[in-house]
Amino acid sequence: MKAWQFTKTHKPLELIDYPEPKAGKGEVVVDIKASGLCHTDVTILDDPGWMQLIKAPVILGHEYAGVIDSVGEEVTDFKVGDRVGICPIDPDTGTSIGGMVDGAYANKMVVPATEAIHLPDNVTFLQGAAATDAGMTSHHA
């Protein structure tokens, strides 16, 4: 599979071959249908000060939505084919997707099932991707 990798400020993202993700215990693999580019991503690309806040190389992208591709053991809230949005920060660890761990500028990614939320059928993947970050921001304001 392919993914866009960030390596250094003021360098373009690099399209790389990336291992196909596999769901472990408590995890889901998401087939990404939409992924946003937000101010954080642009700042990471342009501001060297952000290098201390992320692990590079890293796959950027923390605003995304998609379809469950596979589920790991002990996942009961989701099944293959479910439409989901993903919380950009792990509520249990505070780890940020697309900064501290690889993000959604890829075909698929694996995340803890606790980070996924069901996306209603009347919400597009584009709307769902934008809402994951903006919704979290307004929720915590």
Q: Where do the model's predicted regions map?
A:
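Conserved hydrophobic/aromatic beta-strand scaffold that supports enzyme active sites
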Residues: 5, 15-17, 65-67, 108-110, ...
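Histidine-centered active-site/metal-ligand motif
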Residues: 39, 62, 140
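Cytochrome P450 core scaffold surrounding the K-helix E-X-X-R motif
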Residues: 40-46
